Amino acid sequence: MNHNALYLTQRLIDTCLREDMFGILSNAKFSSAAPKGVIVPQREQVWLTFDNPDFTLYLPVVPTYYMQHWCYGQTNGEAPLGWWVEKNGQVEHQQHYQEWIALLTTLAHESSHELLAGYLQELECAEKHKALCDQAFRHHADHISQPISELGSWHKKLLLADQIASYLDHPYYPTARAKFGLSDEDLAKYAPEFAQSFALHWIAIEKSLVTLTSEQPDCWPTMEQVGLPADFALSHVLFPAHPLTLRSLEALPEGMIEAPFTYLDVTPTLSVRTVVVNDAPHIHIKVPLIMRSLGTKNIRLIKPSTLYDGHWFERLLSHLEQTDADLNSRLFHCNEKHGGHVGEDKTFAYIVREYPLTHCEDKALVPVAALASPMPDDRLFLEHLAEQYYQQDTLAWFQDYVDLLCQVHLTLWLRYGIALESNQQNAIVAFDQQGKMTLAMKDNDAARIWPERFHFATEHAAQKHGAGTNPVDCDELLDQRIKVDNELALGQMFTTITLQLDIAAIVEAMAAKCIASSASLYAIVAKSIAEQLNRLEGEGLETKLARELLQEAPDLYAKYLLSSGSLLSKEASGASDINKFYGLSAPNFLLLSSEEAQRAYLEAIKKSVR
């Protein structure tokens, strides 16, 4: 069994325990007794025992405080070597994700059987793609090792940071490595790990079918440049198309014509479906891509409403940056005014994202997804950044990074009733030449806003400070899921995105490299959150729920993306949005900000085992 299969099996089982998949944790017992007839050299090994009419599962587990209470492992710290299944008096050793999926299928409702079969294919794809991407990492080692601060242009720095980020797996979704729908050859041509340029295809669409949100950018081709008669411009509009998406279509709908020639050389970014225009690198174009990632239900097409909702948040956040002293100079937003769509069709749409040169030209833009990426010298990329921008003081960098995230996102939550889905891909840290960090924002089409608090805050600001008229109205939002009727939804998003994805994942990576203990790093995070809550409360803002969720509750909310995105039907999960399906099950690591507290917590879990 190869290393990648073991790696994926570990991630899969840990996620199943974290999300209590099919009751495998809540219906289990824990014991220190090994399966009958099995000799295990590790003393004090804890076994998760799950009884089912068809079998009994014995899974070796260890207690943890990070994202879940138990994970698949051995007490000696070495990688687990499998589990045991007792059937009809016979004990069988297993260790492959295929066997784990077979167990889950036995436990699952019939509505999940097809989903589990599909997920097995995703696992196999992830195993293959990981091997190919690991090869690409070795091949590009010299290129990605060059100091990012020494590159001549901001856009080369961003592309390099995206490429570095692409080699690191998602912290929590087990098969994020799979770009499901891409062949080996497709991966090499179109994935950021390989950093190859390609040309966009174009579709001429009858104007009567098309909606454009503004004028198309200067880099757009003419009809003649893509091999069509010039007078087509009177009746048609050109839409960009990814080669893979165009290839997947059996035929184009009526009113659409594929242009004979390609135009615009582009390079893929971390998201794969968003590409950089090589000759105009401040222009990024997001195009539909027939690819699934972060869940078999997550097809990377473009919902037309996101064009409008993303631009709505761009206008709002840019306005708040200008009018709120706590946000001023701490963030800037890409221009996402332009896009096009054909009715509600998700396959024929695009968004243009323009990076503002006044904010970018003197900076290095780094997605949060790149920070914990391992480099060829076995250090984390964040260590390289600290060396180049923070006089090698990694802890000083971490302090400033946490303070920046907490100040911006807690202000948005508690003052304005806004929570951004600023995941590791969307959250970008911009370093200036002196090392000062700001946040570059984009793609905020799936945020959450509580209109009651938002309206109160903006009206109060206008009365008190004479702030300019608010440029947006909540009634303009198209995706009604964005608007929430209580504060909990904001707290859940802050916890699962900003705190867990953007901060805790970085903490654990730093601790694994012995840069500092996780306890000391969580102490920095807890202190930063406390300072921001005290500041905001001192200004008269309500912090009760935030304190309950972050400073008092023993468990934090966690996102259950494997459940909602891949293994449970919508009827079973009840999730209206697969990216916002939560469980209250992650230990609150903010309360474990000393090594003594961590040890006591783990010992308490062990003592609960009979």
Stretches found by the model and what they are:
Residues V402-R415:
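An amphipathic, hydrophobic-aromatic interaction surface with interspersed Lys/Arg
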